[in-house]
Amino acid sequence: MKYVDVILPLPLDGTFTYSVPDGMEGKVVPGVRLLVPLGKSKKYIAMATRLHDDKPAFSCKPVEAVLDNTPSLLPQQMRLWQWIGYYYMAPLGDVYNAAMPGGLKSTEKFKPKMELYVELASTYRSEQALHVALNLVQRALKQAKTLTTFLRLSHWDSLDGDTPREGIKKVTKEELMNESHCTAAVVKALIDRGILFTYELEIGRLNTNGESHLDLIKPLSLAQQDAYNGILMQMMKKDVVLLHGVTSSGKTEIYIHLIRKAIEEHKQVLYLLPEIALTVQIMERLHRVFGDRLGIYHSKYSDAERVEIWQKQLSDHPYDVILGARSAVFLPFKNLGLVIIDEEHETSFKQQDPAPRYHARSAAIVLAKMYGAKTLLGTATPSMESYYNAQQGKYGLVELKTRYKGIQLPEIQVVDVKDLRRRKMMSGPFSPQLLAAVREALKNGQQAILFQNRRGFAPMVECKVCGWVPKCKNCDVSLTLHKSINLLTCHYCGYTYPVPTECPNCGSTEIMGRGFGTEKIEDQIAEIFPEAKIARMDLDTTRTRNAYERLIADFSEGRTNLLIGTQMVSKGLDFDKVSVVGILNADSMLNYPDFRAYEHAFMMMAQVSGRAGRKGKRGLVILQTKNPTFPVIGQVVNNDYEGLYQGILEERRTFHYPPFFHLINVYVKHKYDKVCEQASHELSKTLRSWFGERVLGPDKPAVARVKTMNIRKIVIKLENGIDQQKVREYLKFAQQQMGKDPRYGALQIYYDVDPL
């Protein structure tokens, strides 16, 4: 009797063992999907990991069905799953859920997309027979028109002789009805007469149009060519290379040349981007060159589309290039040769909730090593960890310090809004300098971007009389006003509340919004510039793939000229006519209780500033702050990444933070705050007995209650070189001991490794 270990798509650690019935031996191999029972009535699609003869001590159920003829998961993918589960301390079931499209985990069989086609019956496929068919319908005018339309579309009308030729074109039923302006009943009448018949064809959901045109790749500038050569030299010595290039230096063109080289060597390429918005712009550039060799993969695609991409990657003709967001790292590759991680510093590469809380950059580097492939990290503002690795010689380093075609870096003008408010010179959140710059840009047919890293209308509402602030009943946060839907919304659990008309505390009707979100910015700027064509880019306006594409296309083509947005607008988007960028509130990024606050603030401001001044003209950035003397403000103005790096590095060394130490956040959750407090103290005491002063806490996080669950956080700081396996064994053991305590039956403990 053979047995198979499987992963179930449930938040359960480890594998489960099933017996393999005699009739399935040979079909059950690692990587195939199996239908297995669990409990009395549940059935799941499990992933086979290991086939063996080791009879378990318990009675195990048999596999019910093998769903694949060939594996849906390649060996390297399985190893990546196992690494993610181990390193990020996540159940393998959670990794399975994150990795595979829903259609491959569902017990309902995936249905390929079908199209109904119309064809001429074999009886009427000669010139003489066609005349007979036309005579049959000559008095039924709609049928006659539909038949002649079909003959024209399919090219049957241009045939002579009795033998059909290669020139016959397939015609869909929908196309025929649209062209002949007929109903389905008319087509049915022709079918009933035996003149036409219909058949189904699998057409797929993927765009397969477009040949590759590698000859369209633009030649590199001298600076780009030097960087390209430098990357190839470094890749001869290092597995990972960091390309540190200023904004608008033409990094994407270098990537395209590297992709071409990989394709010519018959290798596949994985190109990761942090935001779906970015894939829209870069997709157009890559598609012009690589055509249907390019596949796109991200969460805004339908589940069926993602299944088809997955299956194509397993076929004999996979995509040469995959462009995608974080989840694309899980796709199958048969011959991966190059991984490109653009904007490698971006925090959106890190999955937060649910588990696995993996970092796509780290996972992609590990995946590349499994294939013997090379990894290129590209950014204008490297993460501290990547730059440190490059400085230490772990990664190769190539720098590109000039903008493409000599475009100057933007002029950054710092505006002290505290002084302007005192002199009553501010118009809401807008300084006179910013309004003047936007006015000038619009007058000259240019575009402007306003950056405010807070969506909604107002971050909170408050009673002007007693100071009452409405809070979420499920979470420990104030509610955000969304004026367009006239609701208060919790950005943590999604719960919505009606806007109160009077204060429940004092009865006052003076309830006002406080602060500025992107929605309020949009309202106020529209009053100041009524002639402007304004668009807003935030989570609320980009929930669908089409919404992203429409926003970016409208701004690229000049149908809108003023873009207001959150951090989405900072991420590598390339707009030719943007001459002004306004950073409305730099302080909101700096005054954050996190050791990475300055690093993230610098990156955000440097990146959004880089959107200004693209072709032929130096851009202008208006940076509004109450603290113009903050060192990081000067570093942004002078584009002084090195100064930021050196300043922060010493602090990190002193206070035991990355890149010198690894962090693991241990979270404890429970419905009752008292139980959560007690359990977290008990857990931290156990951890302190092993790790000593490396353990901090427990403390309440910034938001200590989410979705009715109370939270405590324990931080463990681990020096580089510590035995990672021992650390994980200790943590798992402590968690198991807590699980055995009857007081903590409903307690949740989970981990965030290398938190951002």
Show which residues each predicted segment covers:
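A general secondary-structure junction signal
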Residues: 50-52, 100, 200-202, 452-454, ...
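Generic structural motif
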Residues: 118, 412, 479, 511, ...
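Inter-lobe coupling/hinge segments of SF2-like helicase ATPases
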Residues: 215-221, 225, 237-677, 685, ...
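A carboxyl-terminal module marker
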Residues: 685-710, 749
